[in-house]
Regions:
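Glycine-rich ThDP/TPP pyrophosphate-binding loop and its adjacent helix/strand module
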Residues: 5-9, 13-44
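Active-site-proximal loop->helix
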Residues: 63-77, 183-186
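Short, acidic/small-residue loops that bind anionic groups at enzyme active sites
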Residues: 24-25, 45-60
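A glycine- and small-aliphatic-rich helix-loop capping segment at beta-alpha/alpha-beta transitions
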Residues: 40-50, 71-75, 152-153, 188-196
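Short glycine/serine/threonine-rich phosphate/pyrophosphate-binding segments
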Residues: 4, 29-39, 61-65, 139-147, ...
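Phosphate-binding loop/pocket of nucleotide- and phosphate-handling active sites
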Residues: 142-200
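Active-site-adjacent helical/loop segments in soluble small-molecule enzymes
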Residues: 3-4, 9-10, 21, 94-164
Length: 200
């Protein structure tokens, strides 16, 4: 509970600095504490007019996605080797408090491969002219990479439409991790490790 309150403070500080209400919020998740806290905060602030909230997990540790997909009132766990570059999200058991909030207020759950997080790291570290550079690690860049993939991959056009993403969308992200593994950061951002598969 204390951890979630801290994440809620993070969300509130971000909300107070926003010039406009976001249309979408994409949140990376491990057990769901951060995602649950931020989802709960924005749902409390905006009520029925809240942004579209999407939860993003690595496909090797997608316990929230599996729980949402089952939709049977039970939490579903991921066991075994959760071998993902998104080490901070490699969690197999949903947080009960976080899941309660997410089950009520999150709109979508996405399970994504490692190359999506790598793409997010590269774009954030090498932004378009006029944008600020962000040094984000694998877990921190997962949600951003997910949106970048959805917006650029023609095979995901239906998902893009379902999420309501277009050139007018205002999307809020939280990068919760820097380059904690500097060698892997360089391998991904400098050397192109984990390339985007649809571009090959």
């Amino acid at each position: 509970t204390w951890i979630m309150q801290g994440y809620g403070t993070m969300g509130l500080e971000a909300q107070e600095q926003l010039p406009e209400k976001p249309t979408h919020i994409f949140l990376q998740a491990g057990v769901g504490s951060m995602a649950g806290a931020v989802t709960g905060l924005f749902s409390a602030i905006y009520g029925e007019d809240r942004p579209v909230i999407t939860i993003v997990e690595p496909n090797k540790a997608d316990c929230l996605y599996r729980t949402a997909e089952a939709n049977d009132g039970e939490r579903h766990f991921v066991t075994g080797d959760m071998n993902t570059i998104m080490a901070g999200l490699a969690c197999g058991e949903p947080c009960s408090i976080g899941w309660k909030i997410l089950s009520d207020y999150a709109d979508h759950f996405i399970s994504c491969p490692d190359y999506v997080a790598a793409k997010g790291m590269r774009i954030l570290g090498n932004p378009a002219k006029g944008d600020d550079r962000v040094i984000s690690g694998e877990s921190g860049a997962a949600a951003f990479g997910c949106v970048a993939e959805i917006m650029t991959n023609p095979e995901l056009a239906d998902l893009k439409k379902e999420l309501g993403l277009d050139e007018n969308s205002r999307v809020l992200f939280f990068s919760t991790e820097g380059d904690t593994d500097q060698e892997n950061y360089k391998a991904i951002v400098w050397d192109g490790k984990y390339p985007s598969t649809h571009e090959n």
